Amino acid sequence: MAINADAEDDLAEYMDNGLPIYYQLLDGKTPIYIEFTDVIQGRYIVDVEWFPNWGLVPMFNGPANINFKLIDRDVKFTIKTDFFNIGNRMFSFPKYRMDAETIASKEVIKMKFSDIANAPFAFGDMNFDGVKELVIANRKQGQRHHDAYEVYLIQEIEDTSYFNIIDLTDTLPYSNIDATTKFDSDNKTIQLYYSGGACNSSYETYKRVFSAYPLRDYKFELMRKIDYETWDENGDNIPCTKYVYDLIDGKEILDEAISGTVD
């Protein structure tokens, strides 16, 4: 069967795995520039310098510099993240199509943030104080390939020009928040889950500790731990056993009433 020249050109645009050949340019070192055209959260103009890597999972995960600018104040800040991802499907739409020329020319891709089905960042109240934090998704970087999240506290003082960003990525419980985390707004608690297998998982519950000092009002304290284990303190095998510890004055106190073997 003969293949015409146009068909041969079309085939030349794809790799053997069926992906566009220009994906090879997206090696984690080549920048893609994106400007979101809508005002985000009613107050931010955002653009991104992104270094997607087509060889990672999920495809296009990569470092990025996310630049925020307030629309009503002379405030700008940049968040650097390692696993930014918009999703390669976005670039299959004609208005956001990307190709080798777009990449080589460093053309800015103008995109509506609201068009992204699974947004790479969002704003949400992560510590029950009624103020929204900046939350950046790390796609598939959590345990068992769940999404993990970076949390940044936005500090402002009413009737002043004060504006500050606090990186909470090394502060518990914020540092271990992922798609398995449970938030209880009634009790002001966050429960972290650590997957270790059928009977080797654990949970930590943190309770919000409010402060009269606004700039330090974001902390939690560990109040309960639950461990599931199949060995005792001597290292001997035992039936799957649940251990519940309450944290009192910094000490772990076993709650024997609700601890014990499980089915």
Where are the regions that the model predicts?
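Acidic/hydrophobic-patterned starts of short beta strands in beta-sheet-rich repeat architectures
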Residues: D125-N138, S185-Y193
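Structural signature of eukaryotic scaffold interfaces centered on beta-propeller domains
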Residues: D38, A117-F128, T181-D186
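Beta-propeller fold detector
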Residues: I79-T81, Y162-L172, E221-D227
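Acidic, small-residue rich beta-repeat scaffolds with periodic aromatic anchors
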Residues: A2-N67, R73-D74, T78, D184-D263
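Short glycine/serine/proline-enriched coil/turn segments at secondary-structure junctions
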Residues: Q141-H145, A198-N200
